[in-house]
């Protein structure tokens, strides 16, 4: 009988230890913010109407990227502009990145208007919510003619 009680006690203790190990929460998980403006077009709720350019950075002599910020919606997005009509498809693209959680969108994401293709001059990304203490950065790329490479530029974090 004593042996049975000792075995039962050991099994209960082992079960308790295993249960407590697997039931602890992991606080190291990445935290992705979720805001109603994230992934929406800058034209959503007329956010574009209060847009200011926080920085404009030249990618090369024919293109630049802008970090746009809506003072009303408190959102940011990226816009890339080619100073002449694109001569081929996928010539330029922009990306917006939020620093706090790494959320990022390109012109090709839903809510953007697609990459700069032949005959076009610009594209914009969807928005990320960017109220302080959040910060966002615009990144742009423009194809180098006759190669598979791109020139890149990035703005300040704002």
What are these regions (language model features)?
Residues 8, 19-22, 53, 129:
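N-terminal non-cleavable signal-anchor helices
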Residues 28-158:
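Post-signal peptide N-terminal regions of Sec-secreted extracellular proteins
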């Amino acid at each position: 009988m004593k042996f049975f009680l000792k075995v039962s006690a050991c099994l209960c203790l082992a079960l308790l230890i295993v249960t407590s190990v697997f039931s602890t929460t992991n606080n190291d998980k990445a935290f992705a913010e979720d805001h109603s403006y994230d992934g929406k077009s800058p034209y959503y709720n007329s956010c574009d109407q209060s847009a200011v350019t926080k920085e404009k950075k030249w990618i090369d002599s024919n293109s630049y990227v802008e970090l746009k910020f809506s003072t009303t919606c408190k959102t940011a997005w990226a816009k890339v502009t080619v100073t002449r009509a694109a001569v081929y498809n996928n010539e330029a693209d922009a990306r917006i990145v939020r620093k706090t959680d790494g959320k990022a969108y390109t012109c090709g994401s839903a809510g953007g208007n697609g990459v700069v293709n032949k005959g076009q001059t610009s594209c914009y990304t969807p928005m990320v919510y960017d109220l302080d203490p959040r910060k966002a950065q615009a990144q742009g790329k423009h194809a180098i003619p006759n190669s598979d490479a791109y020139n890149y530029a990035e703005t300040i974090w704002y």
